[in-house]
């Protein structure tokens, strides 16, 4: 830049010596050296026109104006009689921009920074900016601890006054922190203070947060952490006097020294609130109560200010000002806090708008709102609307923006900005195990049908042992009050033997309808009726099955028709859901509890009840919610009524991707104990299980029969997915898990079957551990898991790798 100013000054001086002070009339203007710039464009940028009388000052202004266009590296103005001769050298045009050696900074980010400086392909190159760009990039590397980094701009001339611009990076290595010293600390040890830092001079293997690589930004954050640590413990006079960062001669090591003055501890003597409290003085004073002798705490003071703002925000005061001023009494070591509040104007909502909902209708979003148009602005109501939209599961992100109405002193518009996700899914599941081989299922689900909020699903399974189809429809707003109505019809042809379960065939069909009643923001009750017809055949004589048939008045001597049996049941279905998750898909905080149950009603062939309870709790362990602990449980229990047993085909099962991963689906728990062939009365002694027809005593097999009780739990640690940018953080999730579970039969008579496993024992717990990856793909959620069972029992079947599309728990 200094060179350009010097060049301009020299040209101005030379012009003055040529033209003199008297001036002359310009009859014509000629240009030399124009290539890319049109003559007309150059003339328009000049203050001189043909016919003007020009002097030295006019020539100086002309040169200055031509340089200001940014198109020229050199400008000379000469006189040829009455003609003004303008000689220019155009700046070269950038033909290409390339990067070499940059690993820490991506090409896209570099291009954005260059464009912000006016450096882009097709534009002219201002060489004077290159040194600033080089220095700016090197400063960035220095800020992240790479002090040996260098950046050089290489300009290669090309034909037709074009150049190739190449930025060559030598990033070097990150300087590592050799030692962090804190000088002046007496109340707390240096190790205690540094343990709260992100930067460390020593990092144990288990610490995934600490880092020895120096970064200027992290140091600033650590200094603020240090300040907060003292202020939160009563050291109101704490001060960071200075910070020194020293570099070793080889630029690979960093020494950090922080000089502090701790001061004394101070206690709060009182809080005085003043200002415009908008009639809410009592509520505000409740927020400022302190315990006698309480130490001064900076974080609590900040929280108190935020709580006052939130309180006023609930009453429409959208922009309150709250300032706390501590009055320190050094004599008695106390602090009196003076809080000044200015509630400002109360604001009313003119309009609620939605942006980004290209598929979902406005009415679908608007019915989730708790903030009303025309009412005063309630920050809590706006937040509730955001929570409800997130829990719908239709959107990847939901953001709110409160915009003041131009020209109005007390009106705002509330804008909800959503990014829709694909709510339709093609469900396809594949599992592979050493014993099970390959299994799969398929279906289609649309949770936001045509943007109406209706959930419509067609699901089915077709494989060697099952043909299942189901059509379901749910209207979440059957009434304006939010009462939902859902229904389904289904058909199932199930060959249990081919699924490694006990031997029987069940052809069933049915329907049910359910109403959901919202109790409050987080609780919903459900009630409905259902009908199902079950037609059983090919029943091999095993203990649990025969026990059920006996309770129904069906005995082996009466089952000569290939052991067939049918039942028609009418059920009362009920449920309860508590949902306080922060969003519908990939939640990071909150709890969800879901209870589902049914009981047969008069007119049914069976008499039983059955219920399941699912819970899930997400606990973030960092402020950004990238590291989350997830705990899940599933409980199930059912039994007969009036001396009857719950049907064996209603039993609970465990194992598979939705319960205990690493085990083949439905294989955990009690196994079939078959009666010997001589006890059968169907004339067929051909067994399709592990038992032989020559057996004379009940035979234990590996065929799972399930049980009337189930308990499953999972502890999951959700982590950021490696090599995935923040752009896709809401679409991909990685976790490490530990699953446990068991299924048992409370009606199993261990005395009658001594020598066989006690299937009534709930302590036969299976365990597995592994890693899972979930991806919200265009086809629906993809779930990959690899688990290794490390506690299993005889007859359990493992399935280490499991892959599902459209199935999550």
From Swiss-Prot:
<comment type="subunit">
    <text>Part of the Bam complex, which is composed of the outer membrane protein BamA, and four lipoproteins BamB, BamC, BamD and BamE.</text>
</comment>
<dbReference type="GO" id="GO:1990063">
    <property type="term" value="C:Bam protein complex"/>
</dbReference>
<keyword id="KW-1134">Transmembrane beta strand</keyword>
<dbReference type="InterPro" id="IPR010827">
    <property type="entry name" value="BamA/TamA_POTRA"/>
</dbReference>
<dbReference type="InterPro" id="IPR034746">
    <property type="entry name" value="POTRA"/>
</dbReference>
<comment type="function">
    <text>Part of the outer membrane protein assembly complex, which is involved in assembly and insertion of beta-barrel proteins into the outer membrane. Constitutes, with BamD, the core component of the assembly machinery.</text>
</comment>
<keyword id="KW-0998">Cell outer membrane</keyword>
<feature type="domain" description="POTRA 4">
    <location>
        <begin position="266"/>
        <end position="344"/>
    </location>
</feature>
<keyword id="KW-0677">Repeat</keyword>
<dbReference type="GO" id="GO:0051205">
    <property type="term" value="P:protein insertion into membrane"/>
</dbReference>
<dbReference type="Pfam" id="PF01103">
    <property type="entry name" value="Omp85"/>
</dbReference>
<dbReference type="InterPro" id="IPR023707">
    <property type="entry name" value="OM_assembly_BamA"/>
</dbReference>
<dbReference type="InterPro" id="IPR039910">
    <property type="entry name" value="D15-like"/>
</dbReference>
<feature type="domain" description="POTRA 5">
    <location>
        <begin position="347"/>
        <end position="421"/>
    </location>
</feature>
<keyword id="KW-0472">Membrane</keyword>
<dbReference type="Pfam" id="PF07244">
    <property type="entry name" value="POTRA"/>
</dbReference>
<protein>
    <recommendedName>
        <fullName>Outer membrane protein assembly factor BamA</fullName>
    </recommendedName>
</protein>
<feature type="domain" description="POTRA 2">
    <location>
        <begin position="92"/>
        <end position="172"/>
    </location>
</feature>
<keyword id="KW-0812">Transmembrane</keyword>
<feature type="signal peptide">
    <location>
        <begin position="1"/>
        <end position="20"/>
    </location>
</feature>
<feature type="domain" description="POTRA 3">
    <location>
        <begin position="175"/>
        <end position="263"/>
    </location>
</feature>
<dbReference type="GO" id="GO:0043165">
    <property type="term" value="P:Gram-negative-bacterium-type cell outer membrane assembly"/>
</dbReference>
<dbReference type="InterPro" id="IPR000184">
    <property type="entry name" value="Bac_surfAg_D15"/>
</dbReference>
<feature type="domain" description="POTRA 1">
    <location>
        <begin position="24"/>
        <end position="91"/>
    </location>
</feature>
<comment type="similarity">
    <text>Belongs to the BamA family.</text>
</comment>
<keyword id="KW-0732">Signal</keyword>
């Amino acid at each position: 830049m200094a060179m350009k100013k010097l060049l301009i000054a020299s040209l101005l001086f030379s012009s003055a010596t040529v033209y003199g002070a008297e001036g002359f009339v310009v009859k014509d203007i000629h240009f030399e050296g124009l290539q890319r710039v049109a003559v007309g464009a150059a003339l328009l940028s000049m203050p001189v026109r043909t016919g003007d009388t020009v002097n030295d000052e006019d020539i100086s202004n002309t040169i200055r104006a031509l340089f200001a266009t940014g198109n020229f590296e050199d400008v000379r103005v000469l006189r040829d009689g009455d003609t003004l001769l303008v000689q220019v050298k155009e700046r070269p045009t950038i033909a290409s921009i390339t990067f070499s050696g940059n690993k820490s900074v991506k090409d896209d980010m570099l291009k954005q920074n260059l464009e912000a400086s006016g450096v882009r392909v097709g534009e002219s190159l201002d060489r004077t900016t290159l040194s600033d760009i080089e220095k700016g990039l090197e400063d960035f590397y220095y800020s992240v601890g790479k002090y040996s980094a260098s950046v050089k701009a290489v300009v290669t001339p090309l034909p037709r006054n074009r150049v190739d611009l190449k930025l060559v990076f030598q990033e070097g290595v990150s300087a590592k922190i050799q030692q962090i010293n804190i000088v002046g600390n007496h109340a707390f040890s240096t190790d205690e203070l540094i343990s709260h830092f992100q930067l460390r001079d020593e990092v144990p293997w288990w610490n995934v947060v600490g880092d020895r690589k120096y970064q200027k930004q992290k140091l600033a954050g650590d200094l603020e952490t240090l300040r907060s640590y003292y202020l939160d413990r009563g050291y109101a006079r704490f001060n960071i006097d200075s910070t020194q960062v020293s570099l070793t001669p080889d630029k690979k090591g960093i020494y950090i020294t922080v000089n502090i003055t701790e001061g004394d501890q101070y206690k709060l003597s009182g809080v005085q609130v003043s200002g415009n409290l908008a009639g809410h003085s009592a509520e505000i004073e409740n927020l400022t109560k302190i315990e006698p002798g309480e130490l001064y705490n900076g974080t609590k003071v900040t929280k108190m200010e935020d709580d006052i703002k939130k309180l006023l925000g609930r009453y429409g005061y959208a922009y309150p000002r709250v300032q706390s001023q501590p009055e320190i009494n050094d004599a008695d070591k106390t602090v009196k806090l003076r809080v000044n509040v200015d509630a400002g104007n109360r604001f009313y909502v003119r309009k609620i708008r939605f942006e980004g909902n290209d598929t979902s209708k406005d009415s679908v979003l608007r019915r989730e709102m708790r903030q009303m148009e025309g009412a005063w602005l309630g920050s809590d109501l706006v937040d509730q609307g955001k929570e409800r939209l997130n829990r719908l599961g239709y959107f990847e992100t939901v953001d709110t923006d409160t915009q003041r109405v131009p020209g109005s002193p007390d009106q705002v518009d509330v804008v909800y900005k959503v990014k829709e996700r694909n709510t339709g899914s093609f469900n396809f599941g594949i599992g592979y195990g050493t014993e099970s081989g390959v299994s799969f299922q398929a279906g289609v689900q649309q949770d936001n049908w045509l943007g109406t909020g209706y959930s419509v699903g067609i699901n089915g399974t077709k494989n060697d042992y099952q043909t299942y189809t189901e059509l379901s429809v749910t209207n979440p707003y059957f009434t304006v009050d939010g009462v939902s109505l859902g229904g389904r019809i289904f058909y199932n042809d199930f060959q249990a033997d081919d699924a490694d379960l006990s031997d029987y065939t069940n052809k069933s069909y049915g329907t049910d309808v359910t109403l959901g009643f919202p109790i409050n923001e987080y609780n919903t009750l459900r009630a409905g009726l259902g009908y199902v017809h079950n037609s059983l055949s090919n029943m091999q004589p095993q203990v649990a099955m025969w026990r059920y048939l006996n309770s129904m008045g069906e005995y082996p001597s009466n089952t000569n028709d290939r052991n067939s049996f049918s039942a028609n049941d009418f059920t009362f279905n009920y449920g309860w859901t508590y949902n306080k998750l922060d969003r519908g898909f990939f939640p990071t905080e909150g709890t969800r509890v879901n209870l589902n149950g049914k009981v047969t009603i008069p007119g049914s062939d069976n008499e039983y009840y059955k219920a399941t309870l699912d819970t899930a709790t997400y606990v973030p362990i960092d402020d950004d919610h990238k590291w989350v602990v997830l705990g899940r449980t599933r409980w199930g229990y059912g039994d007969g009524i009036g001396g009857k047993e719950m049907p064996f085909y209603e039993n609970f099962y465990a194992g598979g991707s939705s319960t205990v991963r690493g085990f083949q689906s439905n294989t955990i728990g009690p196994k079939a104990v078959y009666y010997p062939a001589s006890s059968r009365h169907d004339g067929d002694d051909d067994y399709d299980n592990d038992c032989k027809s020559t057996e004379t005593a009940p035979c234990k097999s590996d065929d799972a029969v399930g049980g009337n009780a189930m308990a499953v739990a999972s502890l999951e640690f959700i982590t950021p997915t490696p090599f995935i940018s923040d752009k896709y953080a809401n679409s991909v999730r990685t976790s490490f898990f530990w699953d446990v579970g068991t299924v048992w039969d409370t009606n199993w008579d261990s005395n009658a079957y001594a020598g066989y496993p006690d299937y009534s024992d709930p302590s036969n717990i299976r365990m597995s551990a592994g890693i899972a990856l979930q991806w919200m793909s265009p086809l629906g959620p993809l779930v990959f898991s690899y688990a290794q069972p490390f506690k299993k029992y005889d007859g359990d079947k493992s399935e280490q790798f499991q892959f599902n599309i459209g199935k999550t728990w």
